[in-house]
């Protein structure tokens, strides 16, 4: 559970799920992330066991859990509760139960939704940097887009190097 996703509403959802799981006497554990890559590190501890990880958070939390279940017998379940939930919105109509999806890697990091450079990546980064500003959480992304020219004046780098390896898909 990413406790800050969805403006903190993930905590409310986690309490509902916890109550249901106790009532049904399910074998489960609720883990609350504390920082970036925490979900990844937690899930990696279960390599070699067959576990279903329910990712309660946004796209970042889903990405960390998906990256950690790679090359294991574990499964990823998504309970969307972020500000955008782009990956879930993309797959929700076709993925009601179980499906396989493409996953890609850049250097040592996997991604299942989007990897981008330029404007989109800069806006996402600036949105993250602005999370503590006194701006309504649902408006931070729009504010970052509007202020993109201001953010990039001193930090603009147009050089990128791409190397495409033709390895078989995972």
Model regions and ranges:
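Gly/Ser/Thr-rich loops at beta-strand to alpha-helix junctions
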Residues: 6-7, 58-60, 85, 119
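Acidic active-site catalytic centers that drive phospho-/nucleotidyl reactions
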Residues: 2, 59, 100-102
């Amino acid at each position: 559970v990413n406790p800050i996703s969805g403006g903190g509403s993930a905590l409310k959802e986690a309490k509902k799920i916890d109550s249901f799981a106790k009532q049904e006497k399910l074998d489960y554990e609720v883990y609350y992330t504390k920082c970036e890559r925490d979900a990844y590190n937690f899930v990696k501890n279960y390599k070699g066991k067959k576990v279903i990880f329910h990712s309660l958070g946004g796209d970042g939390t889903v990405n960390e859990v998906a990256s950690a279940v790679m090359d294991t017998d574990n499964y990823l379940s998504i309970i969307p509760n972020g500000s955008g939930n782009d990956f879930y919105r993309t797959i929700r109509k076709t993925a009601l139960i179980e499906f396989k999806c493409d996953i890609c890697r850049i250097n040592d990091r996997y991604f299942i939704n989007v990897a981008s450079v330029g404007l989109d990546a800069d806006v996402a980064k600036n949105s993250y940097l602005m999370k503590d500003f006194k701006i309504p959480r649902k408006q931070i992304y729009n504010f970052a887009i509007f202020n993109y020219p201001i953010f990039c004046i001193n930090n603009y780098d147009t050089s990128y190097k791409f190397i495409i390896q033709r390895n078989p898909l995972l």
